[in-house]
């Protein structure tokens, strides 16, 4: 099994999202000891945003880099995405990655019956820290967007691990992280006993 681990938080060692995504990957390693993990830090090694030049792919090095991103995605069976909520949505570095994998003829196609995803059969686990509380979905453009774009690519096995309200106070941050990690542990226990 191949697992692609992406982090997109700009907070480095202070990132709750990075702690959560690492915990999800570790959980997958325990469940599947043979897993082959690839890691990409979209903050430290950002993918260029789409421009007229990157779309034209006139630079052979740029075209090769874009193809490497695509192949890494296509070869993954499981994708763990560290996606913090920034201003109600996702980091622009993660959006740049999505723009490189959402390619007509590669991960989706247009048919007489409408668009059809070509990247099905993958499992995506999204680890996310949010500064506030988003029980009211009208302010959450992150989760619906990720579900929509991944679904458009044919991926329907999508789950979220969330720590909310991490900006409220240090205690709330610690409690939210502990709760999210405990939820992972409960999920793991359920999987083992099933």
Curated annotation (Swiss-Prot):
Cofactor note: Binds 1 FMN per subunit.
Disulfide bond residue pairs: none
Gene3D superfamilies: 3.40.50.360
Presence of the UniProt keyword Lyase in the record: no
InterPro entries per UniProt: Flavodoxin_fold, Flavoprotein-like_sf, FMN-dep_NADH:Q_OxRdtase_AzoR1, NADH:quinone_OxRdtase_FMN_depd
Cofactor: FMN
Residue sites binding FMN per the record: 9, 85-88
Keywords per UniProt: Flavoprotein, FMN, NAD, Oxidoreductase
GO MF term list: electron transfer activity; FMN binding; oxidoreductase activity, acting on NAD(P)H as acceptor; oxidoreductase activity, acting on NAD(P)H, quinone or similar compound as acceptor
UniProt KW DNA-binding keyword: no
Protein purpose: Quinone reductase that provides resistance to thiol-specific stress caused by electrophilic quinones. Also exhibits azoreductase activity. Catalyzes the reductive cleavage of the azo bond in aromatic azo compounds to the corresponding amines.
Family: Belongs to the azoreductase type 1 family.
Name of this protein: FMN-dependent NADH:quinone oxidoreductase 1
Lineage: Bacteria, Pseudomonadati, Pseudomonadota, Gammaproteobacteria, Lysobacterales
């Amino acid at each position: 099994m191949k697992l692609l681990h992406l982090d997109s938080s700009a907070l480095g060692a202070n990132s709750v999202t990075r702690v959560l995504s690492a915990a999800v990957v570790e959980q997958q390693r325990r469940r599947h000891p043979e897993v082959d993990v690839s890691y990409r830090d979209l903050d430290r090694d950002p993918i260029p945003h789409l421009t007229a030049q990157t779309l034209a792919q006139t630079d052979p090095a740029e075209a090769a880099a874009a193809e490497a991103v695509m192949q890494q995605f296509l070869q993954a069976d499981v994708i763990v995405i560290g996606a913090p909520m920034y201003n109600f949505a996702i980091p622009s570095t993660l959006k740049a990655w999505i723009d490189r994998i959402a390619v007509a003829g590669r991960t989706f196609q247009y048919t007489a019956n409408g668009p059809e995803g070509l990247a099905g059969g993958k499992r995506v686990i999204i680890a996310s820290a949010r500064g506030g509380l988003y029980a009211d979905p009208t302010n959450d453009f992150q989760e619906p967007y990720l579900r929509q774009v991944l679904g458009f690519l044919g991926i329907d096995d999508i789950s979220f691990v969330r720590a909310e309200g991490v900006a409220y106070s240090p205690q709330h941050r610690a409690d939210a992280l502990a709760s999210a990690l405990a939820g992972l542990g409960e999920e793991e226990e359920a999987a083992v006993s099933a």
